[in-house]
């Protein structure tokens, strides 16, 4: 039996209007939920589309990177297979070309012979090239050939030639004379100091005797080969100065100039070298160095004293003294952390007792440094003393430094008098000392064995060589020339005599042992 909804409603306790309202609200609620879920579904579908697009983009980037990796590996493999050195036909019979020789020689100038060999080995291994590497003996011989050839070549500027001359010694009585040539007409612009490339090594020669007569002979030989110079620049040694006078017979306007820095050091020595307070400081620096170099004050250890040219190397000592004075007066300094006040005073407090003297010495050093820089960069010319006076200024506070300034200015004024209008000449041998330094760097630990045939390399150390230079030099100078030069200048060396002494002793010991056995 079918029951109508109207009849069914009659059974409900709630009125029909209430039931209708509930049903309507339920329908509205469900409709709202459906709408909300539809929106959420749309959002999720949008996010999914974005993620799919991002994933697709990443996949494309990965594919591109994979292609780049493949291409890089292909190029690497191709490079490994195709690395070739420039064409370099061999010179002579040793199998190495001018390019390889110049490369090895230039490396040796910087890192030594053994270092050059190791550098070449590392470089060729990195390139994946299997080829022969020249040995240190070959590189040494090449550098000697280049050096000897350099000294054999004529000059084209004898009219403006300035010769710098000095001696150097290492062990024993033997000294080496080094003569450098500078073209005064091609000096660097004012404000720039001479460099090694402005120099030519004219002669490097060992000898046991370098008296005035010996130097006269060497000056004459230099003039025969290169022409009479415009000037000879020396450090003030008597034999160098007096020996050069012979050149005035060849050229009346020849000048003998003294190195400014050596002169300044001599003046400083005369002003403060005999000061008892200065001597006391020197002694206390030595004892202080010994007492603190293995303590918590090790970072405040004074510099090692210079055994030679002490008054040319005061800057380091004075810098230490002024720093120590400041630390004593500045307890909060970071450099004093971890050092008790009583320890500071015990080991370094003595420096404060010389505060007034240190101020004088430091002003003298600052004056000398400024003057040396001026001479190095400007040279000697008419008016140099006037410009030097302007550089020094008139604010010196101490009588000692004021007297030093007067004497330095007077020295330059006297030296510039013979110069022609517009002429500029070097007045510093620092570049010569630096040239000796290049040789000592190459020589390294061998300096304890005295001078050897390695000296032949010195002329080739002043500037980098080129393949073209190697070809020309090797065509003129052979390995036999190196042997002849060595036999002439080094018939024996300290090392060879040392070996001979040991050999003689061993021979005598064997004879004595044999005779004792017979008895």
Predicted regions and their residues:
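Structural motif
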Residues: 10-12, 92-96, 427-430, 449
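Eukaryotic helical DNA- and histone-tail-recognition domains of regulatory proteins
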Residues: 97-109
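Acidic/histidine-rich catalytic cores and adjacent linkers
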Residues: 33-48, 52-65, 69, 237-247, ...
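Hydrophobic/aromatic interaction determinants used to assemble and anchor large protein complexes
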Residues: 281-282
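Short, charged amphipathic recognition helices of the HTH superfamily
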Residues: 107-123
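Acidic, low-complexity intrinsically disordered segments
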Residues: 1-56
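RNase H-like nuclease fold core
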Residues: 18, 25, 71, 78, ...
């Amino acid at each position: 039996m079918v029951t109508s909804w109207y009849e069914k409603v009659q059974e409900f306790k709630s009125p029909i209007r209430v039931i209708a309202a509930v049903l309507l609200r339920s329908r509205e609620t469900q409709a709202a939920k459906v709408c909300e879920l539809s929106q959420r579904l749309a959002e999720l579908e949008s996010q999914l589309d974005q993620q799919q697009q991002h994933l697709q983009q990443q996949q494309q980037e990965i594919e591109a990177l994979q292609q780049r990796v493949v291409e890089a590996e292909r190029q690497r493999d191709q490079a490994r297979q195709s690395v070739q050195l420039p064409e370099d036909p061999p010179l002579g019979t040793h199998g190495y070309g001018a390019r390889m020789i110049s490369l090895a020689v230039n490396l040796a100038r910087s890192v030594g012979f053994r270092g050059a060999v190791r550098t070449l080995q590392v470089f060729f291994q990195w390139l994946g090239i299997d080829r022969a590497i020249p040995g240190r003996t070959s590189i040494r011989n090449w550098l000697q050939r280049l050096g000897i050839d350099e000294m054999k070549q004529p000059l084209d500027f004898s009219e403006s030639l300035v010769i710098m001359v000095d001696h150097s010694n290492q062990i024993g009585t033997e000294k080496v004379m080094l003569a450098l040539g500078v073209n005064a007409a091609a000096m660097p612009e004012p404000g720039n100091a001479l460099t090694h490339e402005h120099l030519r090594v004219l002669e490097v020669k060992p000898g046991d005797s370098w008296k005035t007569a010996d130097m006269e002979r060497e000056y004459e030989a230099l003039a025969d080969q290169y022409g009479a110079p415009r000037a000879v620049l020396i450090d003030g040694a008597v034999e160098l100065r007096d020996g050069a006078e012979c050149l005035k017979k060849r050229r009346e306007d020849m000048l003998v100039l003294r190195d400014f820095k050596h002169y300044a050091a001599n003046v400083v020595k005369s002003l403060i070298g005999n000061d008892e307070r200065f001597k006391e400081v020197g002694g206390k620096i030595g004892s202080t160095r010994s007492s603190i170099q293995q303590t918590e004050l090790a970072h405040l250890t004074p510099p090692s004293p210079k055994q030679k040219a002490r008054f040319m190397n005061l800057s380091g000592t004075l810098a230490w003294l002024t720093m120590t004075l400041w630390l004593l007066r500045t307890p909060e300094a970071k450099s004093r952390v971890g050092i008790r006040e009583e320890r500071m005073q015990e080991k370094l407090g003595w420096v404060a007792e010389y505060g007034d003297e240190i101020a004088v010495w430091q002003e003298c050093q600052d004056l000398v440094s400024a003057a040396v820089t001026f001479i190095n960069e400007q040279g000697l010319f008419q008016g140099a003393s006037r410009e030097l006076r302007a550089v020094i200024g008139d604010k010196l506070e101490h009588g000692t430094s004021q007297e030093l300034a007067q004497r330095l200015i007077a020295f330059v004024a006297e030296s510039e008098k013979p110069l022609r209008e517009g002429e500029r000449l070097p007045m510093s041998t620092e570049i010569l000392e630096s040239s000796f330094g290049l040789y000592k760097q190459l020589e390294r630990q061998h300096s304890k064995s005295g001078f050897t045939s390695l000296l032949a390399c010195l002329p080739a150390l002043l500037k980098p060589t080129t393949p073209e230079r190697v070809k020309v030099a090797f065509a003129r100078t052979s390995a036999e020339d190196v042997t002849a030069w060595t036999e002439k200048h080094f018939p024996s060396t300290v090392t060879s005599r040392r070996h001979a002494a040991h050999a003689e002793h061993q021979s005598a010991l064997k004879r004595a042992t044999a005779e004792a056995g017979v008895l």
